[in-house]
Amino acid sequence: MIQRREYLGQLADWKDESVIKVVTGIRRCGKSTLLNQYQEYLRNDGVADEQIISINFEDLDFEELLNYKELHRYIKERLCEGKMTYIFLDEIQKVDSFQKVVDSLYIKENVDLYITGSNAYMLSGDLATLLSGRYVEISMLPLSYHEYCEAAGRESCAELFSDFMKYGGFPYIATTNKTEEKVDMYLEGIYNTVIINDIEERQRRKENDPDKRKVTDITLLKSISKYLASVIGSPVSVKSVTDYLVSSGRKVSQNTVSDYIDALTDSFVFYTADRFDIAGIQLL
């Protein structure tokens, strides 16, 4: 298992600080593994097992804790009086009204809180307002090329670099005996999970906001995703994407395209690279 030293260092730097540590990143980039590694770091630093509460909301064993009141009760019963308790809530966005739990735990003494999520939308709206000035976001990416080589147990070479550029840095890909078919199936699984599950989760969070347009056309979403993937590295705008779709026979507005692109970036399928005016040293 490769040590994600950069992110472990960031968590360690914020240890025992009175801010909530929020780890975000695309599915399968290694967030859960990072939390496990950090918990081991805490144990090696003298933290007792009873001072660590760790819950992964994708684990069926914790299904009853998807109710925020049950979750709050469960954690309260396990807090260590007079000692720091380290709380890890993995994929917290699956819990309805999780903001209430996070806010309640934050105001308690001797609580060091860490949460993860696979959708940036969890940090907008109510949670952002609730936690304003009280959290730090650690944005996690898949493996860097250096980490990829380390995970693969090989020195850098043309073949390894070619694989990295073609398939990306998801940890599983670096460590498995891969064939092109296996990797394609694995990546397709991640993509479909993000498109369907994570964006559906984003929609559920927006249901109470009538001013927000909903992502309802998965075919359109995939079309936009494929187009964006085909023009990576080139200047792109909402208008250029809309023009492409219209020329392909899709009737769609720029507002709709903008909303769908937001959904893709919120789920970390794409990242924006802002354009700079070099002459004026100015962000456009």
Task: Give residue ranges: language-model regions.
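Hydrophobic anchor at the beta1->P-loop junction of P-loop NTPases
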Residues: V23
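Short glycine-rich substrate-engagement loop in P-loop NTPases that contacts/grips substrate
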Residues: I53-T85
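Conserved lysine of the Walker
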Residues: K31-S32
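Conserved P-loop NTPase "ATPase switch" module shared by AAA+ and STAND
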Residues: C80-F98
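Accessory nucleic acid-recognition modules appended to NTPase machines
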Residues: Y186-L284
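Short regulatory helix/loop adjacent to the ATP-binding pocket of P-loop NTPases
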Residues: S104, Y121-E137, A151-G153
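Structural recognition of the conserved hydrophobic beta-strand(s) that form the central parallel beta-sheet
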Residues: F88, D112-S118, S139
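Pre-Walker A adenine-sensing motif
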Residues: I2-D16
